[in-house]
């Protein structure tokens, strides 16, 4: 699963942003839990980046391995034996099949590690990482743009997956959200096109589908994803874990209305109004909601078995409300839905309580902050003067 290294970098960056505890980078961590192999966590992060760079495929994209985040997209398994594990079986050398999702995660991880290195004063390392992220960005633009949306992968035969030229599985949610989060095509308008395609082809009243059209039969070269009935699990259900990536992507593009709309579509308490259909506890997310192709479209499946709650918390608090930790302080950058006049929030961050009051004063999107009555430049609060801070934010 060649996406794994990126998540260590991203989770460490999230820890650093929240706590400001840079000493964790010096912690000695073993490899594969083997005593005597310990090196500092920072070295592990560097190795994570190099792991991907050492595994690049024919189109310049990262090799997928057995799978990536979607552990049912098994492009090197080719299993024809009932009962055989898709996750542990490999019948191809793995030197061709590539993942656009891993490419996007690599960009995110490399840019985060670049900021970590800059904080540590390692400017040369930081610049190198930024260059590697920029190169992968160009690779996605060159090799993974399908005209209206981002491809999902290339298979063992070098054929595109998630392309308008496919009969089934023409568009996938993951690469649209993650590529936008990574900044790919944001300035050029490609990200905007990709999110429009999500809205047109994947969005439903019950959430955003993982892919469309659903796979109608088992495909040896695709693996477990095509073994499920259409509309269930990874085969075109509403896979809730991925929906917040699109919410975040919409917020990045300034689309607060669309971000909130998607948030509410899968929100458990919101769906209690249709509990006879949803059939899930009103206080918990499900892994999936049956998709358009399923007989039980809109019915929740596998409650609790998901990372959706954590990701939706990030989407609503850090990107729609816009209160998010950064390496050098707390950033307040709301993307308000048009129907909101503002909001108030209290945020405890690194021993300081921030009382935040956000008000819309016009139709524009210009953000201005005052901290304890004093205007500041930008949206980052880096040097609070006490353990209780009042933040006033105007938008318009």
Describe the residue ranges of each PLM region.
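Short helix/loop capping segments that flank catalytic or ligand/cofactor-binding pockets
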Residues: 27, 182, 189-190, 356-357, ...
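Non-catalytic C-terminal accessory modules of carbohydrate-active enzymes
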Residues: 200-203, 216, 229-235, 248-396
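Catalytic cores of carbohydrate-active enzymes
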Residues: 105-225, 264, 268-297, 348
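A general structural signal for short secondary-structure junctions and capping/turn motifs
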Residues: 1, 16, 42, 53-55, ...
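Structured core elements
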Residues: 63, 101, 108, 149-151, ...
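Solvent-exposed loop and edge beta-strand segments that line ligand/cofactor-binding
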Residues: 1-3, 87-103, 159-182, 186, ...
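Aromatic-rich carbohydrate-recognition surfaces in CAZymes
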Residues: 1-65, 99-103, 107, 236-259, ...
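Active-site acid/base region of carbohydrate-active enzymes
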Residues: 6-7, 14-100, 128-157, 193-222, ...
């Amino acid at each position: 699963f060649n996406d794994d290294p990126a998540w260590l970098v991203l989770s460490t960056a999230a820890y650093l942003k929240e706590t400001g505890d840079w000493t964790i980078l010096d912690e000695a961590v073993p490899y594969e839990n083997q005593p005597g192999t310990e090196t500092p966590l920072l070295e592990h992060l560097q190795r994570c980046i190099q792991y991907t760079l050492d595994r690049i495929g024919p189109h310049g994209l990262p090799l997928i391995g057995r799978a990536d985040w979607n552990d049912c997209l098994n492009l090197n398994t080719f299993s024809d034996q009932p009962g055989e594990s898709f996750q542990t079986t490999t019948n191809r050398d793995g030197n061709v099949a590539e993942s656009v999702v891993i490419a996007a995660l690599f960009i995110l991880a490399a840019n985060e590690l670049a900021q970590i290195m800059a904080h540590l004063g390692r400017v040369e390392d930081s610049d190198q990482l930024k260059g590697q992220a920029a190169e992968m960005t160009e690779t996605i633009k060159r090799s993974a743009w399908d005209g209206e949306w981002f491809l999902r992968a290339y298979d063992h035969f070098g054929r595109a997956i998630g392309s308008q030229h496919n009969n089934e599985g023409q568009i996938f949610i993951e690469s649209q959200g993650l590529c936008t989060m990574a900044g790919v095509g944001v300035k050029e308008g490609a990200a905007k096109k990709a999110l429009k395609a999500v809205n047109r082809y994947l969005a439903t009243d019950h959430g955003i589908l993982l892919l469309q059209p659903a796979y109608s039969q088992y495909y040896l070269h695709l693996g477990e994803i095509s073994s499920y009935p259409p509309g269930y699990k990874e085969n075109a259900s509403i896979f809730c874990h991925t929906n917040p990536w699109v919410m975040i992507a919409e917020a990045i593009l300034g689309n607060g209305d669309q971000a909130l709309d998607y948030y509410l579509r899968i929100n458990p308490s919101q769906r209690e109004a249709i509990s006879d259909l949803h059939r899930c506890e009103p206080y918990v997310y499900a892994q999936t909601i049956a998709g358009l192709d399923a007989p039980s479209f809109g019915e929740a499946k596998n409650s609790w078995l998901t990372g959706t709650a954590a990701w939706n918390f990030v989407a609503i608090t850090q990107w729609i409300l816009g209160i998010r930790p950064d390496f050098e302080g707390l950033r307040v950058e709301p993307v308000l839905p048009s129907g909101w006049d503002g909001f108030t929030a209290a945020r405890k961050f690194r021993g300081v309580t921030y009382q935040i009051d956000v008000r819309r004063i016009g139709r524009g999107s210009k953000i201005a902050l005052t901290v304890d009555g004093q205007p500041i430049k930008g949206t980052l609060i880096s040097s609070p003067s006490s353990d209780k801070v009042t933040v006033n934010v105007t938008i318009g």
